[in-house]
């Protein structure tokens, strides 16, 4: 299967990265250096430029101290054509362009990158909100309609919560009708998508050497069949709390390892393996949907992993058309190796046809 390729990445005033352009070959690019050298920021910038997505709470966090704006640009080969994707950051907003034309996040290729990082363990051990966010982000990339319905649902929940806080019991039937329609769509889409996601995650978990089978299920606070009834039944509680307590915004993605919930009983190593399995499933699901392998971004390939699982990650990187792998050690077998230091990247080795500037 062919894949998306990040031909080059340019940054200006982005975190601690020095301004400049990096050119990437097909295959594996290894980036090594001490912690704080800019390796993670490089992957974050690449992911932002490829997808338009970031999980920071304030965009100002991405802009270098003392600067008002930042900029990232990716030259992307996909589907046999080259596109230029630009993201400008400033005044609390993102400004996207594709080939010089203003765009929205949904206009960028939705299956262009997958980012594996040590923090993924929080998908296993963290609160339900993190697992919901993972699932919703993935499904929004698989289906633009899902993302649109989710945004409408979240706006409706916020408006209903405002009415609950104001004690507007008389208005609840209006909000309830909208909530049931949107929430039912979300629940049904999640159920359909989870069937394949569960299969792929189970396969990846086994390939990673886990002896305990992994199962993904949804813990739902209501069902499409009972949603309207459940909202009415908890009306008094919701008016008292000033919040909507029933619906897909309260659901959880349950990760079961063997017969026990991984969030409570998995070891740190097992949790890291489960998180890797989720990202591998994400990679395959996006490839199945869009017909091309995403660019694979792997942050700190040695973190919390034994040699066998490190080997799996490196084999995974070698199996896709393009990957960028960071670590405190050199990634073996890389087509291009870059040393990171203070936000700058210098070539250790590269194919003769590839130029990299920093």
Swiss-Prot record:
Binding site for ATP: 33-40
Entry's localization field: Cytoplasm
Record's GO cellular component terms: cytoplasm
GO molecular function: ATP binding; single-stranded DNA binding
Family, as annotated: Belongs to the RecF family.
Any matching Pfam family: SMC_N
Function: The RecF protein is involved in DNA metabolism; it is required for DNA replication and normal SOS inducibility. RecF binds preferentially to single-stranded, linear DNA. It also seems to bind ATP.
Gene transcribed to yield this protein: recF
Protein name, UniProt field: DNA replication and repair protein RecF
Main location (coarse class): cytoplasm
InterPro entries per the UniProt record, alphabetical: DNA-binding_RecF, DNA-binding_RecF_CS, P-loop_NTPase, RecF/RecN/SMC_N, RecF_2
GO aspect biological process, one term: double-strand break repair
Record keywords, A-Z: ATP-binding, Cytoplasm, DNA damage, DNA repair, DNA replication, DNA-binding, Nucleotide-binding, SOS response
């Amino acid at each position: 299967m062919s894949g998306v390729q990040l031909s080059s990445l340019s940054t200006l005033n982005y975190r601690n990265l020095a301004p400049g352009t990096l050119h990437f070959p097909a295959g594996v690019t290894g980036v090594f250096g001490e912690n704080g050298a800019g390796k993670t920021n490089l992957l974050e910038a690449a992911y932002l430029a490829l997808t338009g997505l970031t999980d920071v709470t304030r965009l100002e966090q991405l802009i270098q101290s003392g600067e008002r704006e930042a900029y990232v640009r990716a030259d992307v080969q996909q589907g046999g054509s080259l596109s230029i994707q630009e993201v400008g950051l400033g005044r609390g907003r993102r400004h996207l362009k594709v080939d010089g034309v203003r765009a929205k996040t949904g206009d960028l290729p939705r299956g262009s990158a997958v980012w594996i990082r040590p923090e993924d363990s929080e998908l296993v051990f963290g609160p339900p909100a993190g697992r919901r966010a993972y699932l919703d982000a993935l499904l929004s990339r698989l289906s633009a309609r899902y993302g649109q319905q989710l945004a409408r649902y979240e706006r409706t929940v916020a408006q209903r919560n405002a009415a609950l806080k104001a004690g507007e019991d008389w208005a609840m039937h209006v909000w309830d009708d909208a909530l049931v329609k949107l929430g039912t769509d979300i629940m049904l889409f999640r159920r359909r998508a989870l069937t394949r996601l569960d299969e792929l995650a189970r396969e990846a978990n086994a390939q990673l050497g886990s002896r305990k089978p992994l199962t993904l299920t949804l813990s739902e606070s209501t069902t499409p069949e009972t949603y309207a009834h459940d909202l009415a039944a908890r009306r008094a509680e919701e008016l008292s709390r000033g919040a909507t307590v029933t619906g897909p915004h309260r659901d959880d993605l349950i990760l079961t390892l063997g017969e026990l919930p991984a969030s409570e009983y998995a070891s740190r190593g097992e949790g890291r393996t489960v998180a890797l399995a989720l990202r591998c499933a994400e990679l395959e699901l996006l490839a199945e949907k869009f017909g091309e392998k995403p660019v694979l971004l792997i942050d700190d390939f040695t973190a919390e992993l034994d040699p066998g699982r490190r080997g799996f990650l490196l084999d995974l990187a070698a199996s896709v058309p393009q990957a960028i792998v960071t670590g405190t050690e050199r990634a073996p077998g890389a087509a291009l190796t870059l040393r990171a230091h203070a936000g700058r990247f210098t070539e250790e080795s590269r194919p003769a046809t590839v130029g990299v500037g920093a």
